[in-house]
Regions:
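Extracytoplasmic low-complexity/disordered linkers and repeat tracts associated with LysM-containing
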Residues: 1-169, 175-180, 185-189, 193-195
Length: 197
């Protein structure tokens, strides 16, 4: 569900509520979601319909019940002001946030194989390559309304449902050495530099 909400700049909570699901629900293959199209931005670059591919990715969660329970307990207790934010990778920012130019995040230039770490503690809600233009992507939920995304990875080292700390390596960068990084608040992209120390 997170990958679908991410693709359409839609709040996971609102998408889940509109469909009578909890925001951590796992979708089943072929399950149909009700999208209020008047509130959903259409993407010109994606002609794929929602359904089979995203549902298969969402249904393939390898996290065990204990780690999911631990993650859910942590999410219920976390306060955003208590999160300690850090940069996700050592490198230079080469593309800045600019929503007018459809730049929803920032790009760090580092080196191939560099370690990527979460900007703050959170729960992995998506780990895969089912979203166009992001390559191998990790999305982490930090609170009820804050998500961060890490794209263009060569190798993912975490699984959906896993609780991760800010110092933990979650992925390795691909051949370009670039990390696409985004933060969303209530489903909408915000300038990541407002959060990073």
């Amino acid at each position: 569900m997170y990958s679908i909400a991410w693709r359409y700049d839609y709040s996971v909570a609102n998408l889940a509520k509109a469909n009578g699901l909890s925001d951590l629900s796992v979708l089943q293959e072929g399950q149909i979601l009700n999208l209020d199209l008047s509130k959903v931005k259409k993407q010109q670059s994606s002609k794929r319909s929602i359904g089979t591919a995203d549902s298969k990715k969402a249904a393939k969660t390898s996290a065990n019940t204990d780690s999911k329970t631990q993650a859910n307990v942590w999410l219920k207790k976390v306060k955003t002001r208590d999160l300690k934010w850090r940069e996700p990778v050592k490198g230079k920012i080469v593309e800045s946030f600019n929503p007018k130019k459809l730049r929803k995040g920032i790009v760090f230039q580092s080196a191939e194989g560099s370690s990527v770490r979460p900007v703050a503690k959170g729960v992995v809600v998506y780990a895969g390559d089912g979203l166009r233009d992001y390559g191998k992507l990790v999305i982490i939920k930090h609170s009820d309304y804050l998500l961060s995304a890490y794209g263009h990875n060569r190798k993912l080292l975490v699984r959906e449902g896993q609780l991760v700390d800010s110092g933990q390596v979650i992925s390795k960068l691909g051949s370009s050495g670039r990390l696409y990084f985004e933060i969303r608040k209530d489903g909408k992209p915000v300038n990541p530099l407002l959060y990073l120390n």
